[in-house]
Structures are given as C-alpha cells and as structure tokens.
From Swiss-Prot:
This is Ribonuclease HII. Manganese or magnesium. Binds 1 divalent metal ion per monomer in the absence of substrate. May bind a second metal ion after substrate binding. The keyword Ligase does not apply. It comes from the Bacteria. Gene3D superfamilies: Ribonuclease H-like superfamily/Ribonuclease H. Residues 1-182 form the RNase H type-2 domain. Its cofactor is Mn(2+); Mg(2+). It catalyses: Endonucleolytic cleavage to 5'-phosphomonoester. Keywords: Cytoplasm, Endonuclease, Hydrolase, Manganese, Metal-binding, Nuclease.
Length: 183
C-alpha cells in the first residue's frame, strides 16, 4: 500500500493562512527531510522535484477560517478530505493527534518518512510564497522575512500599525504588552 504523507505549515503563525499538504511519491527523491531543516533554496529545488514526481494536494485555510473554525477543525477537515482524495493509501500525519479522523500519526514523521518530508516541503514552500506576496501589500509588516510568525519584528509591527486583513484575530499573544510611554 502506498504511503500518503501529510504535514502543515503556518499552524503557529500570527498572520496568513495555514497550508496542509498531502503527497504520494511516484519515486524516491534524495534529500527529503523536515522542511525547517532545509535552506530556502534547497526547499524550492525539492518542491519542483516533488511536484513533478508525485500526486499531491495542498489545502489552504485562511486566517478568517482559522479564527472561525479553530486550528483543530481546519486540520480535521483537511485530513478527512485527504482520506477521500487518497483513498486506498496509508495516510500518515506528522504529529500526535489525528483529530478523530483515524489517520495514522507519528511525531517527527517529516524527518523519518520521505512522503511526510515531501508534504512538509510542499506546505512550507507554497505558504512562504503566499506570505511573500502579502509582503508586497503590507511591506511594513516584514512578512517576507518572518512569514507571519510571532517574531520580535512582527510583534513590533503589530504594535506600531495594528492588525491587518491577514492577522489571526483569535490568537492571543502571551507575554506581549505594547509598551506605553509615559509623558
């Protein structure tokens, strides 16, 4: 039975979509790994090899959908969709929760199973490209560099400019208080 690897990118971001990818490889591809362990250049090279040598699907959940449904429900919907699209495959999701879908899970699967590593790369590269496009619309937020994650620069931009249309309004930023200047 073929393995269908599943992973997501953007889950913990403060802005932008979450991308969830599923991938069945037609042939082995050398160098697959957890996307976070690869350079951006290598991820892009592998992205093109993966898209040419696999059957894959990438699902995006907007910041509005994440705010309305929650991350768990978004992931549950993606996993159920992948069960239909990749019927007959053994589905393996990187993590420790299957969100009630019956999909198999494995912690650090993106570094252990090449199909999950491929899904990790598909999700990360596709989401990063979207965030670079948003950077052109909101250059003051620096999305090109931090991709919407809660870096110091991103938190400072939120303090200075407020949230924008791709901000996740439901995310509470712990230990973040805009500084107040006393006169």
């Amino acid at each position: 039975m073929q393995v269908c690897g599943i992973d997501e990118a953007g889950r913990g971001a403060l802005a932008g979509p979450m991308a969830v990818a599923a991938c069945v490889l037609n042939a082995g591809i050398s160098g697959l790994n957890d996307s976070k362990k690869l350079t951006p250049k290598r991820r892009k090279e592998l992205f093109h090899l993966i898209t040419q040598n696999s059957r894959y699907l990438i699902v995006y959940f907007s910041n509005e959908q994440i705010d309305e449904l929650g991350l768990s429900e978004c992931l549950r919907r993606a996993l159920n969709l992948f069960k239909l699209y990749f019927a007959g495959c053994e589905l393996l999701y990187d993590g420790n929760q299957n969100y009630g879908t019956g999909v198999q899970t494995m912690v650090k699967a993106d570094a252990k199973v090449e199909e999950v590593g491929a899904a990790s790369i598909l999700a990360k590269v596709s989401r990063d490209e979207l965030m670079c496009a948003w950077d052109k619309i909101y250059p003051n937020f620096g999305y090109k560099s931090h991709k919407g994650y809660g870096t110091k620069a991103h938190l400072e931009a939120i303090t200075k400019y407020g949230q924008n249309e791709i901000s996740r309004k439901s995310f509470v930023i712990k230990n973040f208080q805009p500084s107040l200047e006393l006169f």
